Amino acid sequence: ARERMDEEELEAFYNCVRIIVKNKHLLKSDVRNVYEEQLD
């Protein structure tokens, strides 16, 4: 699939991945907080 993407799309894709990886711990704690609020 990588050959079909142009460089701009590839860059956008890697930026998305980088942001997700960087914010993974934040995502996990947000999800946990949402569930804890629902349980109260």
Swiss-Prot record:
Catalytic activity reported: RNA(n) + a ribonucleoside 5'-triphosphate = RNA(n+1) + diphosphate; ATP + H2O = ADP + phosphate + H(+)
Position of the signal peptide: none
Entry EC no(s): 2.7.7.48, 3.6.4.13
MF terms in GO: ATP binding; ATP hydrolysis activity; RNA helicase activity; RNA-directed RNA polymerase activity
Keywords: ATP-binding, Helicase, Hydrolase, Multifunctional enzyme, Nucleotide-binding, Nucleotidyltransferase, RNA-directed RNA polymerase, Transferase, Viral RNA replication
Source organism superkingdom: Viruses
Recorded family membership: Belongs to the potexviruses/carlaviruses RNA replication protein family.
Function: RNA replication. The central part of this protein possibly functions as an ATP-binding helicase.
Name this polypeptide is given: RNA replication protein
